[in-house]
């Protein structure tokens, strides 16, 4: 039985298969190795991938894009609100959760983000099964390093609903290193690897220390304001200006015409990664006018010059954050479809002239390839001289905190597991509660960076009941947190006086 790795990104999804000692991305039924993460609801059917993306011009209100941005979030979450404001499909609140409102004329229904992700996972499963000629269930799924517990849980539920058996969730930077076997060739050496990922809607830069075969995340930064879509939009705006210059018609306020230009610009952007020029032709763009325009790579680079600067600045900030110079970096790994852009690769190379830049695996395929290798390891298919399983040490992406009450009665948060903690990990903490109560509720929260902890950040709670009340003093509650490498969290609370105990497990899937 083959093992597979699946990467579900904001704009695209990809599946790789590990078989006969190697991992390869497999093409979908359209012959493409990368599938648009787009779902369209029609009167009689649901379509996923390129067909949904192409039909969006005529069916925008019932076509869902960038579902990963909203997956596992509450309706009130600022990230969800941003997604809702930018989406052509109506999103409503139901039980505190966002739901897509679908109305095809034949069907009116509410669809959750998990339902949409399930359809994309099902497409990936079908793609793998078609390539292998047999059923496939075991999978390793990639997640961004800054994905919270609720997001991972939602992603896992979607994959399970699609019929997958999740072997493990692996952070995207770790998958990228696995794809190139980094740490395998010199397991006792120490090196710094910078993982640069420019995806469809975000940019992430991660510094990983590889030491004695162990991956340790030194720092990571994610920027949601820059991604491949920004380059597409910039090119589409240029095409709109060219149309106005030629035909004296300003179409930038016409949503349908601009969506057509976005599709054409996206195709041209991809072509310009390998060609010196690309042709943008749109049939009946506006008022029956066919639009035909050629764009050179040099022109594209000029149009996007400010975007390139935005893509490079985060690298310099990360180096400063970890106290490294460019010469301290041993390798740079490129990930994400937009990391294919030659100008971007040149700018990164200028920053690291003496550093090995790894891009032999297509950047939009490297993460699922690494996930497939991890799946092969977990199924016992890997037979390398080095046990790669020893180097896939995951790290905690966010701080895990417990809410307590200080002496003045105000809430305070104590970090039990700080971000960057290598997994598996175990921590103990004594929580004190007033002796005159008979039950204690332990609440756990997660927080990324210096963000404020709010109720939106709570992901688990455990209640210890029927405690013997005390006339004076406090209850000492011993709390033990154990997080496994797969991200599952086991929480045990024990009253030190009575020995009464409760335990819960928070699974990643």
From Swiss-Prot:
The keyword ATP-binding applies. GO terms for molecular function: ATP binding; ATP hydrolysis activity; ATP-dependent protein folding chaperone; heat shock protein binding; protein folding chaperone. InterPro entries: ATPase_NBD, HSP70_peptide-bd_sf, Hsp_70_fam, HSPA14_NBD. It holds the Pfam family HSP70. The keyword Disulfide bond does not apply. GO terms for cellular component: cytoplasm; cytosol; nucleus; plasma membrane. One of its GO terms (biological process) is chaperone cofactor-dependent protein refolding. Its main location: cytoplasm. It comes from the Eukaryota. Component of ribosome-associated complex (RAC). Component of the ribosome-associated complex (RAC), a complex involved in folding or maintaining nascent polypeptides in a folding-competent state. Belongs to the heat shock protein 70 family. This is Heat shock 70 kDa protein 14-A. It comes from Xenopus laevis. The lineage of its organism: Eukaryota, Metazoa, Chordata, Craniata, Vertebrata.
């Amino acid at each position: 039985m083959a093992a597979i790795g699946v990467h579900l990104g904001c704009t695209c999804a990809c599946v790789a298969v590990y078989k006969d000692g190697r991992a390869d991305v497999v093409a979908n039924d359209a012959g493409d190795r990368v599938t648009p993460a787009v779902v369209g609801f029609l009167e009689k059917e649901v379509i996923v991938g390129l067909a949904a993306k192409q039909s969006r011009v005529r069916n925008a209100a019932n076509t869902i894009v960038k579902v990963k941005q909203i997956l596992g979030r509450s309706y009130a979450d600022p990230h969800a609100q941003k997604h809702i404001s930018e989406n052509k499909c109506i999103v409503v609140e139901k039980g505190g959760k966002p739901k897509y409102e679908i109305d095809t004329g034949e069907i009116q229904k509410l669809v959750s983000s998990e339902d949409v992700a399930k359809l994309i996972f099902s497409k990936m499963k079908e793609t793998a099964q078609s390539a292998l000629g047999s059923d496939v269930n075991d999978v390793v799924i990639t997640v961004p390093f800054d994905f919270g517990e609720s997001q991972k849980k939602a992603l896992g539920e979607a994959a399970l609903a699609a019929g997958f058996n999740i072997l493990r969730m692996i952070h995207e930077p770790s998958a990228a290193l696995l794809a190139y076997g980094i740490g395998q060739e010199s397991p006792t050496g120490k090196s710094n690897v910078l993982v640069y990922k420019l995806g469809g809607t975000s940019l992430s830069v991660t510094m990983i220390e590889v030491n004695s075969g162990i991956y340790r995340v030194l720092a990571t930064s994610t920027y949601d304001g820059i991604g491949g879509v920004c380059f597409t939009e910039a090119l589409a705006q240029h095409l709109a200006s060219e149309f106005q210059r030629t035909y004296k018609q300003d179409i930038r306020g016409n949503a349908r015409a601009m969506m057509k230009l976005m599709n054409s610009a996206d195709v041209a952007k991809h072509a310009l990664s390998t060609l010196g020029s690309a042709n943008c032709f749109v049939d009946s763009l506006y008022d029956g006018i066919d639009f035909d325009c050629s764009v050179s790579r040099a022109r594209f680079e000029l149009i996007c010059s400010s975007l390139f600067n935005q893509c490079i600045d985060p690298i310099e900030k990360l180096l400063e954050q970890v106290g490294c110079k460019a010469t301290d970096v041993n390798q740079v790994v490129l990930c994400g479809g937009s990391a294919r852009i030659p100008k971007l690769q040149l700018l990164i190379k200028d920053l690291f002239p003496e550093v090995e830049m790894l891009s032999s695996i297509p950047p939009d395929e490297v993460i699922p390839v690494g996930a497939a290798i991890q799946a092969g390891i977990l199924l016992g298919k890997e037979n390398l001289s080095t046990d790669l399983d020893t180097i896939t040490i995951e790290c905690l992406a966010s701080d895990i905190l417990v809410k307590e009450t200080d002496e003045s009665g105000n809430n305070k948060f104590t970090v039990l597991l700080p971000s960057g903690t290598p997994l598996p990990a175990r921590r103990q903490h004594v929580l004190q509660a007033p002796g005159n109560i008979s039950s204690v509720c332990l609440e756990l929260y997660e927080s990324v960076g210096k963000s404020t902890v709010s109720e939106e950040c709570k992901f688990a709670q455990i209640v210890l009941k029927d405690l013997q009340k005390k006339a004076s003093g406090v209850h000492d509650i011993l709390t033990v947190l154990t997080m496994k490498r797969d991200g599952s969290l086991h929480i045990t609370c024990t009253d030190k006086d009575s020995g009464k105990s409760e335990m819960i497990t928070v699974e990643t899937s």
